[in-house]
């Protein structure tokens, strides 16, 4: 490879080379010069590749293949919007057919194959571009050449594909594909390989040396570097300070943070921030640590610069100022204290402190006696001398201390003592002269009192208190000499005492002035003594040191005491404020407490004065679980305390909550509605097909739930309500009207919940028909009523005024009633409903209560349907008879002993008003009732005993035992809402049944 082949300056270098040869070989013979020129011409005749238009370095953005768009065309370096240019090459020294192969190589030497691909409209395949050069111009212009970048994970595959087509211009191999991090994906170079045609036409096997272009950078990564914001513009000289830098988009693999310092336009120090590629966030934020400054012992902040630098091309951003602060920055108090302690040996300070403490402990406290005749400066002069003496002793006892310091201190103390002695001597001389003048004036006044009296008004500066002396003396001159002498002596004595007082006041004023002057001199800055150093060190240890503040001296004890007094006063003030705050808090608390107590007392007083609510004390809200006793419409006043069980504890603890779950039953005798007067029963009309709809204003109360397990018994109660039996009275008296709620629309509707272990009431009320009965009932549906199939009596439509009184299976039945052809018989009959649809039997109901007919109505027969018996199982001639004529067991007029015992245990009356109480049930129900009685009363009855109807009646007339507190829950039917009605006792039930039957 020749120099002119690697760059585009070959033509321009020719003259320079010739000139250089002529200069170098001027002294050679002409023949040698001709030979050299001939060899140079031969070299020039060898063809080579020249790049006439370099590609633009930062004008193109590399596109990924997944972006699905054109990579764009690489413009030329001299391209403008008006005159666009493109990369161009030219073959020099050859004219003929030739082919050029263009591929991407790395930016740095050695030039290795780059994984990025070249794409274009023509000639581009497998990442390289192959074109035939124009043989006339020997120039090739690449006007449609783009760069398509690959991802890091695809580098190895791209280089492997390049290896398969054997495109390796500089024979460097493809081993770098296993080191993807060593490849700069943001910059490439274009490599041009030219192959000339050989002697065989169509075969280009003569290669020329390859040439490479200038680097081409990805415009996305090579954008302008800009620092937008720095979280801090200063750091300590130690470095390692974390800084967050915000910038424009940068490539995290090709960015660095540069710190540098310049002096006189030249860089004297340079360092780079420490960070990893993972510290670059979204290409717009860099978190790095500052480098260590080259000098640590700086006292002033050092001004440096910070900038972004791109290592690939060396481009830098605009430099911003940055400061390196001293290592004690932000710690002035600590470092100043440290330096102050290092000025003098620490042993000197500590020894001085210990010596003074020991001296204070040994010497007893002394009382200072102040002489008014002697100035206080003498006392103050003793303190430096004492300190000097102590210092000399310390120097003698500690020879290891520095002698220079002791000499300086001695000289200073001597000079101070001499100055103070001279000053005190001058002051004492002035005081003596002043006193002598005063004494002379006093003696002169005593010798010549009369002359003194005349001269006193002129001497007001000395004594203004005796200005009135001439007036007194002139007023008291006696006539005789003795009186004059006595008066003169008295006046002299008075004047002497006044003069002494004046002298004392003058001396005191002078002494104060001297003290103030001396104190002002002492407060002037001067070298520190041992005590000064101790005091300053103690204050600095408390972090109270201030720069250039004069240290307190031993003579300023008065100021220290005043400061202590002010601190004590301040502490006292703080304590007083605290006490005041506590007193205020206590007062507020007391007021609030009194207000709260008064409020409670007022409320209690208001409650006491308020009229009590009209609430019946006898009402027991826990008694609602006996809701089945409310069987009739009109209420009856009943003494609740005698019948109802006591209130459970939970109702007392949470009465409000109890009212949320059930409705109280109000029993008021005044609210009773007048009973409908009994009217005679009209004669039975012929059968008329009419549909009886039950009234909607009243509903039967639900049955009591079982107390064995907590469950929602509403479904069972609804099933029981829908399946009841009515008795047909034989008299014309009209009974009470009761109406059922509307039946469900679904004929197969069943509300019984599924229970794994059904209880007593579930077994008693939910017995179903057998399959043979259901099959037989479908055949005879046109003749028989659906209730006959289930053998279950019902009081779904009970109306004493209905001439065709009969039983329906449920309120769902809409078929007409068929009256019994034998009106003399008053027993309940099974009505026939031709054409009715057979309904699914529901739970058995034993809520029907009837009275046994008198003797003339076959009173010795108790009708108890046995298990398995039905109307279908009876002979055909008996189907039209009443229910009392079918499948009965004659018990007789009396009850057996076991039955009577069971009834007595259950507190059930056996007979009332010449009649016996009966009920209808099957054998399984009787067995369940016996088990219930045995469990409640703790007795053992005969398992084979069949209870009579009277025992079943006791199930609804007796009061259930007291409910446990655990049964008071929301799902229990004990608290189901019921309609207002009256609760009847067994006696009242018997009386009403007798009246209904005409007894």
Swiss-Prot record:
Instruction: Spell out the SUPFAM superfamilies in the cross-references.
Output: E set domains (SSF81296), p53-like transcription factors (SSF49417)
Q: Which GO terms describe its molecular function?
A: DNA-binding transcription activator activity, RNA polymerase II-specific; DNA-binding transcription factor activity, RNA polymerase II-specific; DNA-binding transcription factor binding; high mobility group box 1 binding; identical protein binding; RNA polymerase II cis-regulatory region sequence-specific DNA binding; RNA polymerase II transcription regulatory region sequence-specific DNA binding; sequence-specific DNA binding
Gene Ontology cellular-component terms listed = cytoplasm; cytosol; neuromuscular junction; nucleoplasm; nucleus; subsynaptic reticulum
Q: Which CDD domains match?
A: IPT_NFkappaB, RHD-n_Dorsal_Dif
The answer to whether the entry has keyword DNA-binding is yes
Q: Where is this motif: Nuclear export signal?
A: 668-677
Biased composition of type Basic and acidic residues is found at: 710-719
Annotated segments matching region Disordered: 1-44, 389-424, 670-851
In which tissues has expression of this protein been reported?
In unchallenged larvae, expression of both isoforms is seen in fat body and gut (isoform A is more abundant). After immune challenge levels of both isoforms are enhanced.
Feature: compositional bias, Low complexity: 402-424, 819-829, 836-851
Q: Which positions fall inside the RHD domain? A: 47-342
Motif (Nuclear localization signal) on chain: 756-773
Q: What GO terms in the biological process aspect are recorded for it?
A: canonical NF-kappaB signal transduction; dorsal/ventral axis specification; dorsal/ventral pattern formation; immune response; innate immune response; melanization defense response; non-canonical NF-kappaB signal transduction; peripheral nervous system neuron development
Look up the signal peptide feature and give its range: none
This molecule's function is given as: Embryonic developmental transcription factor. The lateral or ventral identity of a cell depends upon the concentration of this protein in its nucleus during the blastoderm stage. Acts as a morphogenetic transcription factor that specifically binds to the kappa-B-related consensus sequence 5'-GRGAAAANCC-3', located in the enhancer region of zygotic genes such as Zen, Twist, Snail and Decapentaplegic, promoting their expression. Part of a signaling pathway involving NF-kappa-B and Toll-related receptors, that functions in the apoptosis of unfit cells during cell competition.
**PANTHER family linked:** DORSAL-RELATED IMMUNITY FACTOR DIF-RELATED (PTHR24169:SF25), NUCLEAR FACTOR NF-KAPPA-B PROTEIN (PTHR24169)
Q: How does it assemble?
A: Interacts with tamo via the nuclear localization signal. Interacts with emb, a component of the nuclear export complex.
Name it.
Embryonic polarity protein dorsal
Name the lineage.
Eukaryota, Metazoa, Ecdysozoa, Arthropoda, Hexapoda
